[in-house]
């Protein structure tokens, strides 16, 4: 396929895609991250995550993946920096009681020292010094990157 043809295909797809947050359901059935990879990020997290743990999701997108974990909302926090997703998180996560704060994963996190038992980050920026700062002693950091 020639470059112009590919660009035309992408433009057509973009015009019909309804992307909100980190929801790419418009490509459902064409690619499945969970089955096309030799690991399952969600299962890895769930192997460690316990209901009493305090969880932070850095760069949560629209919060879809975070919500799929079904962790107690009062023990759940999230950050996001992309303006459309910030608004989406305010509308979806805050009403549930999730502690959502606008912020970029590569900068200083807007949380106290040693606040979290587990920090996750899926395809987002992160700062290892900040991860270390907000994790409790013996805490767990799990990330999946492109």
Regions found by a protein language model. Name each.
Residues 1-26:
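N-terminal, positively charged/glycine-rich alpha-helical extensions of SAM-dependent methyltransferases
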Residues 49, 70, 134-135:
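A generic alpha-to-beta junction signature in SAM-dependent methyltransferases
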Residues 54-108:
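Class I SAM-dependent methyltransferase SAM/SAH-binding core
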Residues 32-54, 64-65:
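Conserved alpha-helix/loop element of class I SAM-dependent methyltransferases that forms part
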Residues 126-142:
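A short glycine-rich, Lys/Arg-flanked "PGG" loop and its adjoining helix->strand segment in the class I
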Residues 108-118:
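A short acidic, Gly/Pro-enriched loop at the edge of an enzyme's catalytic core
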